[in-house]
Amino acid sequence: MAVCRKPLKKIEEGGAGAVHVDVMDGTFVPEVSFGQPVVRSLRPLTKLPFDVHLMVQNPERQIESFAALGADWITFHQEAAAGKEAKLIEKIHSLGKKAGISVKPGTSAETLKNFLNSADIILIMTVEPGFGGQKLIPQCLEKVRELAALRSELGLSYKISVDGGVNAQTLDSVLQSGVDIVVSGSAFFNGTLGWR
């Protein structure tokens, strides 16, 4: 795992607050990526919290495993868990982890309203999940603004995260939308984020 030390060191030195790990199953999204063996290998290499983003069908099958491997935050997609969201949030909390729920660009923020009082993190995908290096879909930031306004109006404390297409050109508009957590992969690692 020596090959993983360099990116993790860059993440730490760049001032990141967590390591975001995309887990893709090739079914919910077309790509396949990091699985349990990779997380098991990476976890001992950093003290930063691990933010595991389950872009998978049937996320309930993987929550316990990733919790046991050291995930600190576990986020699943509303679209993959329709009807089971509350149970999954409860399950993640019962394992002592922070629970996140995510939506794709085409899914309305309305689908999240019943979970805003129990989720710790609301992750808004600003690209179609599954591939890095895509352009941010600006209309998705309207969901962030809506969720930030609701949080204030209802006195809730969930964090709002944005994932996808964040780079030097989009960072300002993302930060002005009311977001708390910015996920950046391609732009961070290729040095074009323009932010350290």
Model-derived segments and spans:
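Glycine-rich, proline-tolerant flexible connector loops at the mouths of alpha/beta enzymes
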Residues: V19-Q36, F76-Q78, V127-K135
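Hydrophobic faces of well-ordered beta-strands that scaffold small-molecule active sites
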Residues: V19-V21, L42, F50-L54, D72-F76, ...
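Alpha-helix-loop-beta-strand connector modules within alpha/beta enzyme cores
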Residues: V32-V52, K91-S102, C140-I160, G164
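Glycine-rich phosphate-binding active-site loops on the catalytic face of alpha/beta enzymes
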Residues: I74-A82, L123-Q134, S177-R196
